[in-house]
């Protein structure tokens, strides 16, 4: 897990948000998402090269990108759920992540990728998830 200085600046050094981000990344580690994506990309790449005949062609890379993007969004949702759970277990509100994703959305502005090729769920979806997780934690 790598934490950049840009991330720390973005959240103004807020330790609770940093804890939420680290909990999210820990979710990826626990679910072995990196290894799964590597295996999936390799398998889809081989299949695409067999079907298309030339892996170097742009056409052969399309299934790899689309397949990985869809899997990646699911992996991000699982990691978000892990983050919310770990925050609750530590006595912190998952709501700390709402402000984080609002800042991310503001930073990205007009430079967003279409959902078909985006590797992460839409910021609005993630904000809604963490708001709901915070509301459930208060019950």
Question: Where are each of the predicted segments found?
Answer:
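A Zn2+-metalloprotease active-site environment signal
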Residues: 1-139
């Amino acid at each position: 897990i790598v934490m950049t200085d840009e991330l720390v600046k973005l959240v103004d050094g807020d330790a609770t948000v940093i804890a939420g981000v680290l909990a999210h990344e820990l979710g990826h580690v626990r679910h072995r998402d990196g290894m799964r994506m590597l295996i999936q990309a390799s398998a889809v790449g081989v299949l695409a090269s067999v079907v298309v005949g030339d892996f170097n062609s742009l056409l052969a890379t399309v299934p790899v990108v689309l397949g990985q993007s869809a899997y990646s969004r699911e992996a991000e949702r699982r990691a978000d759920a892990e983050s919310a759970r770990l925050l609750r277990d530590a006595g912190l509100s998952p709501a700390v992540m709402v402000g984080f994703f609002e800042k991310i959305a503001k930073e990205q502005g007009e430079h967003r990728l279409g959902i078909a090729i985006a590797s992460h769920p839409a910021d609005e979806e993630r904000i809604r998830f963490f708001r709901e997780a915070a509301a459930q934690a208060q019950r």
